[in-house]
Amino acid sequence: MTTLRQFFLITELRQKLFYTFALLTACRVGVFIPVPGINGELAVAYFKQLLGSGQNLFQLADIFSGGAFAQMTVIALGVVPYISASIIVQLFLVFMPALQREMRESSDQGKRRIGRLTRLFTVALAVIQSLLFAKFALRMNLTIPGIVLPTLLSSKLFGVPWIFYITTVVVMTTGTLLLMWIGEQISDKGIGNGISLIIALGILSSFPSVLGSIVNKLNLGSQDSSDLGLISILILALVFVFVLITTILIIEGVRKIPVQYARRVIGRREVPGGGSYLPLKVNYAGVIPVIFASSLLMFPATIGQFIASESSWMKRIAALLAPGSLVYSICYVLLIIFFTYFWTATQFHPEQIASEMKKNNAFIPGIRQGKPTQHYLEYTMNRVTLLGALFLAAIAILPSLLGCLLRVDSNVSYFLGGTAMLIVVGVVLDTMKQVDAFLLMRRYDSVLKTDRTKGRH
């Protein structure tokens, strides 16, 4: 209640939240603007046929894009190219020590260089994906004539409808770049991580369809396995609560390392030592590993689906990487564990912490300062990270288990248990932390201003 009251009282916070809300609303507008020359209603009908035949990959892609994928709108690619580009750049950083040094010495300049690289890769990946998307739309048009307007198919160059290809590539790439820009603006001038908020908004927008699926299949007295009976509803509710509580515990959980301070001289006074603790987060990476792993698996699988009819080996790869398959689940778990460790290694710097502790005469009881402290922090963080990574992976594969156990629609299992819930809860918690941090800074500023005023008098 206090935070809510301060929201209405603090003008700057109110402006940030309204700015964020306005940009996120603009994102949703793009869901209803189809790519020129494509009939969105017929496209949705085609995708429903695919979902009926078990093509769960498109269901996952549609959830991530907030319904834009199935309607073939201008933002159908979503932020997946941007996330894939971020993964590529972060992996490149491991082999670019010069850029890593620049990041440490001048973080602003290093971030600008990384931002430019990420944008370049985003454009390249968006162009590739939109080309494949256009090719897939032409294949859809053979099944349901009218998905692509005939006027765009009349002009051909070497047998290729070049006007349709150029239009689709330009429009869809622009849509992805617009989402990327909106995400960056929210991160800079609004509240929360912009890209994560866009993904979370897309997931939340699927809630009405999830609720509709549950209501349509709800039959408490039925013995039919295709209906949702009382036991199935109870299991879904328990899984939802379990995922919610477990996600909060994983993201908020910390391992407290005891820290002691020796006697220090501040000015002319000798300050006695005291005790404190160093919090090491159980899941330092948050929901980043889940977003990265989902996007990375979605990229090759989507390409495989788009060109599967022309290549038998690509068709096999697409089938193997379909959400819910054994290979997909194994790759998903391994990627989540890998990205959890990878992101933690890039963001957590034990050598800096050990150096700062030594400067401030702080030490961990039983551990010498300097290198021994650094090694101890690395060892402890590795053990804690393993626990967090395994929990993330276990929750992320819940949709597959739910789908097999309860035979519910894939959109229901994805939303109520697993990846979608992890992302939404993680993004909400992160945004709340940023609001609290902003309020804390405001409180400190007001205290400092009061002290300065008293000093003048």
UniProtKB/Swiss-Prot annotation:
Keywords: Cell inner membrane, Cell membrane, Membrane, Protein transport, Translocation, Transmembrane, Transmembrane helix, Transport. It is a multi-pass membrane protein. One of its GO terms (cellular component) is plasma membrane. The keyword Membrane applies. It is found in: Cell inner membrane. The central subunit of the protein translocation channel SecYEG. Consists of two halves formed by TMs 1-5 and 6-10. These two domains form a lateral gate at the front which open onto the bilayer between TMs 2 and 7, and are clamped together by SecE at the back. The channel is closed by both a pore ring composed of hydrophobic SecY resides and a short helix (helix 2A) on the extracellular side of the membrane which forms a plug. The plug probably moves laterally to allow the channel to open. The ring and the pore may move independently. PANTHER family: SECY/SEC61-ALPHA FAMILY MEMBER. Component of the Sec protein translocase complex. Heterotrimer consisting of SecY, SecE and SecG subunits. The heterotrimers can form oligomers, although 1 heterotrimer is thought to be able to translocate proteins. Interacts with the ribosome. Interacts with SecDF, and other proteins may be involved. Interacts with SecA. This is Protein translocase subunit SecY. It comes from Chlamydia pneumoniae (Chlamydophila pneumoniae). The lineage of its organism: Bacteria, Pseudomonadati, Chlamydiota, Chlamydiia, Chlamydiales. The gene is secY.
